[in-house]
Amino acid sequence: MSLEVAYSRISMTDKEISLLKKCIGNNKIIVEIGSYIGKTTCALAENNTVIAIDPFIDGYDPDDQVVMLGVEEIFKKRIKGKDIIWYKAKSEDVLKSWEIMIDGVFIDGNHMPEALNEDVKWIGFVKKGGIIAFHDYNYKPSVTNFVDEKIRPKYQEIGRERFLIVWRK
């Protein structure tokens, strides 16, 4: 599968990005877990500081074997000169030394339950009134089940578009 075909299948749509930007607002600090080629990363960085976290590892999800070859280079070129701080790491590794409160977290990384359990630990750094967003809701059963069981009972849903769901803390 070519990179273009794989990307078109999994990427955020313009409507999803528009909703996410509207829910976040401007002049915020946002952690993005899972950046791929940086389309959403750059869109969010137009009016915010984005902390992008992606290890660029192949095959973390056995149901979705998107090859990451070349993706990291595209990402690096795309983010150059923008208000983006990039960590080539797993989110749990960055979290170990994290100390700054953030305005929101956007989770679109490894969709396996173990990884989701690690990624949601970032919610502890989201300020009250901040946002918690997930991509691939109603697309990846692991994401849907996780969100319905662990997020829905605790937070207020404020937006949904295609595979994006956004919550207020």
Report residues per predicted region.
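S-adenosylmethionine/decaboxylated-SAM
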Residues: 3-7, 14-169
